[in-house]
Amino acid sequence: MIGQFNLTFELAWKALQEILRLHGAEGADTGSPREILQLGYKLGFVNDSAVWLLMLKKRNTSVHIYNEQEVDEMILLIRDSFIPAFVALEKTLREKLAEAESDWT
């Protein structure tokens, strides 16, 4: 589950970066997940910056989880906080992509 979280986080922030680029957001070309998440929050693409920055931190430290208690804590975070944030981002990105596509026609 933790490995899937890491993969999903990577895909999520990179998808956010692409949609920000489509909308012409200045600064979207950076390679930094932190900057992309902060820009996404500033522009209203991300609802809860604290959750996303916590995800970034947990993604970076999850490779160093060595005991069952830490695994259990991470699973609870994923279930209770991170999955809802991914779902909300998916909805927002679909809407923003549709907006960008309608501008092309």
Residue ranges, per PLM feature:
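Solvent-exposed interaction patches of small proteins and small membrane subunits
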Residues: 1-105
